[in-house]
Amino acid sequence: MSPIQPDLVDVWIFRTRADRPPTAGEPIEILLLRRAKDDAILPGLWQGVSGGLDDGENAGAAALRELAEETGFGPHQIECFYHLDQVNQFLEPGLAGVVTAAVFAVRVAPGAEPVLSGEHDAMRWVSPEEALEVAVWPDYRESIRRILENLLDPERAAWFELKLNGERVRP
């Protein structure tokens, strides 16, 4: 098997309001980050974490590195790391081809707060409903829906969970 290496990773961050794993129907908050207004790429866009892979880096490692770089969240704040079984593809104007992004999600501890990098100039924790309204790209909305459908039920979430080294957690 020759896996295709994605160009980018997207990481969606959520937290519960209680100090326990989420359950279906329980309120969660999703972190939205606004790209800096002076950024060359999509200034002012509300998004999750997004970034490229370094040479020789796998997608899971890139997701955790980008998460730390853009929010300061590391192993002590991460409660669970998930793949969303989603690879987005889009045509970026000015590039000669299609760009792919592997999509991940991270549940951080209740009360955890990001420390923003210069890439973003604002952040806000919002309800999933507000995140769906604010998300510009259809793939962003699909990622949010996958969090709601797959990661709030502990039995189902176990199938998507990864160790921090990128290996699957076996349910």
Segments the model singles out, each with a brief description of its role:
Residues P27, A68, G72-A112:
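Active-site segment of metal-dependent pyrophosphate-handling enzymes
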